[in-house]
Structure formats: C-alpha cells, structure tokens
C-alpha cells in the first residue's frame, strides 16, 4: 500500500500532566519503586496515545511520558553513568564514570507496550552518540575511563545499534536519533558559550557518529531530528541552516526532521541545499509559541517548502517535542489542538495535490 502524501508524525514528547511529572521525579528520588512507577505509567501512557490518535496523527509515540528527558533516558538504562553530576548547558546531566554497557532495553519496553495498544505506525526515539558525548562526558570524572568525548561517543554506537535491533523486535516502525547539537552549531554565540573552537571538526564528528549508528540498518525506517534546543519555551540558539547543509548531505539516513515553523530557524530558502534523495520532516507547528496555528497557516508553510522539496518527500510534524524534559511548562490541550490543526492541514493538502 502506497504511503499517502503529507503523512503526519510527532517528534517524540508530549507535555506531561503534573501527576505524571510527580511519578517520574518520585521514581528518580527513590520515593517510588521502579515497579510501582511503571504500573502507574501503564495507566498514563494510553492517554498520550489516545490524544495523538484523536488528533489524527498517523505515526505516534508514547509521549516520552516514562522519561525524565529525551537524553537522560540513555544514562538511566545503560550501565556506567552517575546521575546529575555533570552541569551542561546550565542544567544537571548524568556523567560517564565507568565503561558503559548495554544492560537492559532503553526504549524497547516502551515500544512493546505501545504496540500492544495501537495499530498505527510507531516512532521510537533515542539520543544520538554525539549528544550523549556532549552532555554526559565530564572533563574530570569521565577521563579515567574515557579520555576524550570522542571515546565515549564511540562506545555509545554499539549500544545504540543493539537497542535498534530490540526496537525492531518490539514493533517500532521508525527509529529517530535526536541530534540537536548539529543545528545549534549554526549560532556563533552558542558555539562560543559551549567552547566549540572548530565547527567543521564538530560537524564532521557528528555526521560520522550518526552514520556509524545508522549505517546498514534495515527493517526499520531511519530518521534524525535537528532543532535549536529549547527550555521553558525559549530556544537555546538561532540561525538558518545554511552552515550545516553540506553536513546533512553526508548523513546516510532516510528522513531528516527539522524546525521550520519557528522564526529562529530562518526561512525556507536553506531547503535549496537539502539532500536530493532524503525525505524532509518539516517542522510546521511552532512548539514554543502558544498560538495554535490554523490549518491554513500550516498549509502555507508546507507549500513554501514544496518550492524546494518534492511533495512526495515531505512529512509533517511539530518543530520539536512539546516537552523534551519534565521541566518544560507546556499545556497538554495546546499540544492536542496544534496536532489536530496539523492533521487537518494534511487532509487539505492531500485533497489539493493527490
């Protein structure tokens, strides 16, 4: 069966209700056992699924409601990390303090639960090797085991590939590696703040890590997600994608998901350099703006992208996850209404262009 034009998906996370945030933090601080938390979350996750289905989203996630954040989940499930010892970007992150080792599924159990409750396509999300190295390598505590960030990144690759095999077995249709660092490097202020001295080296390293993680993967659609990073409804960087477009053309992946609804990403003109065979995940809903876009506004954004990318290669999704960590103060109803508008825009576009 042919894939319809303008399919809809999400990037990963949905806003977490207060009681779900409490579950995650109580589990983290030991006030609730892992088993007790999972039992409660088994009641919560179907709500996240139902929201997406009612909004008309065709490829769904579990809202990442079982996770504290999109990136910390790696350290929570993989041996070798100590929690919240590494201040990175002004926030506490885990740090690698021992050789990392695949111990149990990172996201496969999430997917298996979701597969038992939906017939829709399912997207699984994992952090990229590069973002793990950037966020979880500590210049003092990690160096006895991993003398460089690169050495930690290299050890992440086989762990991620093993998890992708588990995700396929669990029923995932798409594996998306989240790689915000590649796009935030377009901002010279961000590069200076994070001590990025050789941006070409960093981009090449990022591309190499993504290719090592995804090269040769079959039986599941491969995707990466880029964004300008956000916290508390504010972006952490800004700038058009022109600087990184040559790097995107070197990544061996089926779908590249990018922000284009937010003004901080610049205009659609950068899509003139987008890889010619790769599908574009088009961010067409601004997750940082409380304004709920009309379907017509979204259609207009998609049609602007069609000036550069064939309609058969365009997938619709929000710019980013609505709540990459439990701290993000986004409204669940707002997310639903934005997703509903996006699905209606897809319907309008299909009627017009199919």
Roles of regions detected by a PLM:
Residues 1-354:
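Domain-level signal for soluble alpha/beta catalytic cores
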């Amino acid at each position: 069966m042919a894939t319809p034009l303008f399919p809809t998906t999400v990037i990963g996370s949905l806003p977490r209700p207060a009681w779900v945030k409490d579950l995650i933090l109580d589990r983290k601080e030991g006030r609730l056992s892992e088993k007790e938390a999972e039992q409660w979350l088994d009641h919560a996750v179907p709500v996240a699924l139902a929201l997406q289905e009612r909004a008309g989203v065709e490829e769904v996630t579990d809202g990442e409601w079982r996770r504290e954040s999109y990136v910390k989940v790696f350290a929570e499930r993989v041996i070798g990390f100590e929690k919240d010892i590494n201040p990175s970007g002004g926030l506490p992150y885990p740090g690698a303090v021992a050789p990392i080792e695949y111990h149990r599924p990172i996201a496969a159990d999430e997917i298996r639960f979701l597969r038992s409750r939906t017939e829709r396509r399912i997207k699984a999300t994992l952090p990229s090797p590069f973002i793990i190295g950037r966020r979880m390598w500590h210049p003092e505590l990690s160096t006895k085991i991993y003398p460089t960030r690169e050495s930690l990144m290299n050890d992440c690759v086989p762990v991620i590939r093993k998890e992708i095999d588990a995700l396929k077995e669990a029923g995932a249709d798409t594996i998306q590696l989240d790689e915000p660092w590649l796009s935030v490097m377009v901002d010279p202020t961000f590069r200076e703040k994070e001590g990025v001295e050789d941006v070409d080296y960093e981009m090449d390293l990022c591309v190499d890590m993504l290719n090592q993680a995804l090269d040769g993967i079959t039986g599941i659609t491969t995707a990466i997600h880029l964004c300008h990073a956000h916290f508390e409804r504010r972006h952490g960087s800004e700038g058009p994608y022109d600087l990184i477009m040559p790097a995107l053309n070197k990544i061996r992946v089926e779908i590249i998901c990018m922000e284009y609804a937010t003004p901080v990403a610049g205009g659609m003109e950068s899509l003139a350099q987008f890889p010619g065979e790769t599908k574009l995940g088009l961010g067409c809903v601004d997750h940082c703006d409380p304004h709920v876009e009309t379907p017509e506004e979204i259609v207009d954004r998609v049609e602007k992208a069609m000036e550069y990318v064939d309609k058969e290669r365009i997938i619709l999704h929000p710019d980013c996850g609505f709540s990459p960590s439990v701290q993000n103060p986004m409204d669940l109803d707002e997310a639903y209404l934005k997703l509903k508008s996006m699905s209606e825009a897809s319907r309008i576009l299909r009627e017009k262009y199919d």
